[in-house]
Amino acid sequence: MTDIGREAQFTLAQSQLPVENYFDEKTFELEKSRIFGNSAIYVGHEKLVPERGDWYALAHEKNGRALVRSAAGVELMSNICRHRQAVMLGFDTEHPQGHQARQGNLKETGGNIVCPIHRWTYSQNGQLLGAPQFPETPCMNLQTFPLQNCHGLLFEGPRDPAADMAKLFSRPEFDFSDYVLDRVEVHRCNYNWKTFIEVYLEDYHVGPFHPGLG
């Protein structure tokens, strides 16, 4: 447990951030660019799409991107049609609010990704295969994003998660080969990310806030 019993702990630390750093938009843009933009960002687990043709739309991105299992493996790609920017996978034309489904299989659309608006059709790796009534198929493929797979955990970004977390991934509890994905929960929280990390990194709150874990 953290040693907080000494009065010196209550003095202002030299490294304490100014209050404005939690609210300044320019600071936030720098954080997104220099911290998150240069990190390995967790996207999801490969068990979200266990079979070829399976897709999973990223709800925390409002279905703007999706994981798709192709013959080459798991792909992360844009889920927005290049023609009129419609959401494709997960779009329910019979639902009053449109895109609602989170996952499925492409066998429902002949093994391809098909836009519900004008039927533009893309392959499982995002290549545009056809555009109805166009004399030639435009060169307008879906944007794809490189993924790094570590024990089934999928990351995007320039850093190598296997190198950053080598000791962590060597532990037996990170072997998910015999697991089956049950469900995914998404919690959207309205607070500064630094506040969450600061609380997460101290264990003073564990006893009263997480009974049984202290």
Regions found by a protein language model. Give the residues of each.
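Short, contiguous pre-domain boundary segments
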Residues: 5-19, 177
